[in-house]
UniProtKB/Swiss-Prot annotation:
UniProt entry tagged with the keyword Zinc: no
Organism: Methylococcus capsulatus (strain ATCC 33009 / NCIMB 11132 / Bath)
Domain notes per entry: Has three domains with a flexible linker between the domains II and III and assumes an 'L' shape. Domain III is highly mobile and contacts RuvB.
Family affiliation: Belongs to the RuvA family.
Gene this protein is translated from: ruvA
Top-level taxon of the source organism: Bacteria
Renumbered residue ranges of the record's region Flexible linker: 144-153
The name this protein goes by in its record: Holliday junction branch migration complex subunit RuvA
Length: 201
């Protein structure tokens, strides 16, 4: 089992990132809650990880805190919740807010998350009410300057739309959400954060 990964951040295009660990490139998917705290390209990053092994693929997921990873692991144990949907949930709500929703049985807020309908929200509350395995809160990943060369930057709006689609939004919905937030000089991370916040209001 891979508990964490530390190396140079080579590329990041939500929800995927590439980390160079002593010359070996690891591809990971991460929730936006982790992306918001990533350093610049070329800096060192340390992430907690979860390795998912299936017959057709081995997938690695990265998280800025143990709490995020703990919630991810709890989510994918719920019937009908896969890794992609679990990342979308983590991208749209904080660990503490999710815990509060489950404790208060607040399905109304959960259904505003991408890919979550009424039945799924109710299932999350029922199955996680007594067994949330979130783990111990942790500081953001340690990072400092490294030596990797930056890659050409993608258009922030296009990158934001692609990230939202990868998180479960329909293309038209993703385009609309980003268009509402678009402003000159905003980064892809800023656009994604604003779009997700407007989607769950």
């Amino acid at each position: 089992m891979i508990g964490f990964i530390r190396g140079l951040l080579v590329a990041k295009r939500a929800p995927s990132l590439l980390i160079d660990v002593q010359g070996l490139g690891y591809e990971l998917d991460a929730p936006m809650s982790t992306f918001y705290n990533l350093p610049e390209i070329g800096a060192e990053v340390r992430l907690y990880t979860h390795l998912q092994i299936r017959e057709d693929a081995h997938s690695l997921f990265g998280f800025g805190t143990e709490a995020e990873r703990g919630l991810f692991r709890s989510l994918i144990r719920v019937s009908g919740i896969g890794a992609k949907l679990a990342l979308a949930i983590l991208s749209g709500i904080s660990v503490d807010d999710f815990r509060a929703c489950v404790e208060r049985q607040d399905s109304a807020r959960l259904v505003r998350l991408p890919g979550i309908g009424k039945k799924t929200a109710e299932r999350l509350i029922i199955e996680l009410r007594d067994r949330l395995d979130i783990g111990v809160p942790s500081l953001a990943p340690a990072s400092f300057a490294g030596g990797a060369a930056p890659l050409p930057a993608a258009d922030p709006a296009d990158e934001a739309v692609s990230a939202l689609i990868a998180l479960g939004f329909k293309p038209q919905e993703a385009n609309t959400l980003v268009a509402r937030q678009a402003a000159e000089g905003r980064s892809a991370e800023d656009l994604i954060r604003a779009a997700l916040q407007s989607a769950v209001r």
